[in-house]
Amino acid sequence: MTAKSVGNFSIWLVIAVLSVGVGGYALYLTATGFEHLGLRNPMLDPWGLRVHIAASGVAMLVGAFQFFKPLRQKAPTVHRWTGYIYVAACTVGGLAGGTIAFFTTAGPIAGWGFFLLAVFWVPFTLLALASALRKDFAAHERWMIRSFALTFGAVTLRIYLPIAIIQNHGDLPLDAYRAIAWLAWVPNLIVAELFIASLPRLKRRKAAPAPAGV
């Protein structure tokens, strides 16, 4: 295993651990209820929230493993069926998230941030499925990267929130939450697009023959 492959695996492992951790916590919340979270918005549909959190949790649990090359190569059937689970979870989670986005107590700026996340998340995921079904695996890879970048917004959201709370001595100002509603996913998508743009060069380099020894 080369240093580069070790580095790539390490990056994937960090992403997978964070995703599984957040996804597992989401399912724990779904199973135990949300009363201990102190939700104060009476207009928020608790079932819409439950569906969003549960489905998004499933997407987080299985999403990172769709990019695990040994799984794709050695267990393609497992890869395919966990992919179907991922697509279903993202679709349900995104639709449920879109329905509750504007009930946030942080106002319409945060609401639009969460709503547009759902607007992009669902079609990106369905386009990943459609490209796989027509065996256009290059397009499938691109759309899956975009989809998972948005799925990973659940992780980045939970990275930004405690940072904002610590910086504000235990409080979370509404302005900070409004910013986080966008920061949780827009930078992820930008990074995904930059990575997608680099894929042809990375694949050419990987396919190039090794230099002859001196």
Positions of PLM-derived features:
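Alpha-helical membrane insertion/targeting regions
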Residues: 1-214
